[in-house]
Amino acid sequence: MIPGSFDYHRPKSIADAVALLTKLGEDARPLAGGHSLIPIMKTRLATPEHLVDLRDIGDLVGIREEGTDVVIGAMTTQHALIGSDFLAAKLPIIRETSLLIADPQIRYMGTIGGNAANGDPGNDMPALMQCLGAAYELTGPEGARIVAARDYYQGAYFTAIEPGELLTAIRIPVPPTGHGYAYEKLKRKIGDYATAAAAVVLTMSGGKCVTASIGLTNVANTPLWAEEAGKVLVGTALDKPALDKAVALAEAITAPASDGRGPAEYRTKMAGVMLRRAVERAKARAKN
């Protein structure tokens, strides 16, 4: 499997990258870590004539706090996410999820922006970003705009990004101190996409669930924010009847493909299993 021929560009600034993408139009694709784009180029599912490599743009790298948000540059690697003490304290679910992406070699190159941006339903960050209520900063020829992660994904590899735009940063509201969290992922082997996965972030008070948010990975042609499933957990002790209702609501919105990871019915049920496990672990971690 060999990609088609292409011209290679390596801009030094966001402005230069946007100018290149605008000039080259639909024949160009931005290149982050390459672990989503290069495989589909090898199979000729993507045949860009130009690659715009973003790795020399320092403004796309870094983790900082702005008000009540954590802001992560799009070219920040998964390895850097795992090693960040700041994220471990503020958003530990990002570290937990990053550790389940591929393998250490890929995590040294793979970026949070690349994982989130291109609309691959098998990637782990999109559903997590929806669960966390994140927003994407998109920068293009008309300047920067903000799009909620829950509004960004339109279909497999189809997103709200416009021609000439780049995902430059991800803004994530910091959950309350003492929140519970978990990312549960079923996969066939190290490095594989999820058969099904679930992200859960919740808060507890007096033994009752106060807030709950759920994201589901690779069980539809987009990541899924299971809003209704989260709502039925609120006000409960997260006991079995409440979990049964949440699982049923989450399973009802899935539409996985039957593939080498299993038939659609199996993958739907595994989404429910992953959700149940994630809620139970998140509950155990939450402080009342």
UniProtKB/Swiss-Prot annotation:
Record's keyword terms, sorted: FAD, Flavoprotein, Oxidoreductase, Plasmid
SS bonds (residue pairs): none
Function: Catalyzes the oxidation of carbon monoxide to carbon dioxide.
Highest taxon above the source species: Bacteria
KW Metal-binding (keyword) present: no
Binding of FAD, residues: 32-36, 111-115
Gene: coxM
Catalytically driven reaction(s): CO + a quinone + H2O = a quinol + CO2
Enzymatic class: oxidoreductase
EC numbers, comma separated: 1.2.5.3
Domain FAD-binding PCMH-type: 1-177
Cofactor note: Binds 1 FAD per subunit.
Keyword Flavoprotein assigned: yes
Signal peptide: none
Protein name, per record: Carbon monoxide dehydrogenase medium chain
PROSITE patterns: FAD_PCMH
MF term (GO), any: carbon-monoxide oxygenase activity
Alphabetized SUPFAM superfamilies for the sequence: CO dehydrogenase flavoprotein C-terminal domain-like (SSF55447), FAD-binding/transporter-associated domain-like (SSF56176)
Stored InterPro entries: CO_DH_flav_C, CO_DH_flav_C_dom_sf, Diverse_Substr_Oxidored, FAD-bd_PCMH, FAD-bd_PCMH-like_sf, FAD-bd_PCMH_sub1, FAD-bd_PCMH_sub2, Mopterin_DH_FAD-bd
Organism of derivation: Afipia carboxidovorans (strain ATCC 49405 / DSM 1227 / KCTC 32145 / OM5) (Oligotropha carboxidovorans)
Oligomeric form and interacting partners: Dimer of heterotrimers. Each heterotrimer consists of a large, a medium and a small subunit.
Cofactor section: FAD
